[in-house]
């Protein structure tokens, strides 16, 4: 299971631990991923995603999953999120 947010594309970053003596050792900074169930109001269904807490705050800030997916570019979304976005576009067109 990859450590990438399904909605924002946020993944791991590489950096250093720096000691008091300025010795540097490589380390990973992992995103805070949570398994969440988000409700789509237009589709009247819920979807499970593995989302970073940053992504979850962004979804809530934009007024829910539907608005977030319609605003977000396709390149950052996972395959499952893209599928939901296509369903939303199809439902809103009908």
Curated annotation (Swiss-Prot):
Keywords: Ribonucleoprotein, Ribosomal protein. The keyword Plastid does not apply. Pfam families: Ribosomal_L28. Belongs to the bacterial ribosomal protein bL28 family. SUPFAM superfamilies: L28p-like. One of its GO terms (cellular component) is cytosolic large ribosomal subunit. Coiled coil: none annotated. One of its GO terms (molecular function) is structural constituent of ribosome. PANTHER family: 39S RIBOSOMAL PROTEIN L28, MITOCHONDRIAL, LARGE RIBOSOMAL SUBUNIT PROTEIN BL28M. GO terms for biological process: translation. This is Large ribosomal subunit protein bL28. It comes from the Bacteria.
């Amino acid at each position: 299971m990859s450590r990438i947010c399904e909605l924002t594309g946020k993944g791991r970053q590489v950096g250093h631990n720096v000691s008091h003596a300025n010795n540097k050792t490589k380390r990973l900074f992992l995103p805070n991923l949570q398994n969440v169930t988000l409700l789509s109001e237009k589709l009247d269904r819920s979807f499970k995603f593995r989302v970073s807490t940053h992504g979850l705050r962004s979804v809530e800030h934009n007024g829910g999953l539907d608005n977030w997916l319609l605003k977000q570019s396709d390149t950052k979304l996972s395959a499952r999120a893209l599928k939901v976005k296509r369903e939303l576009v199809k439902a809103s067109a009908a």
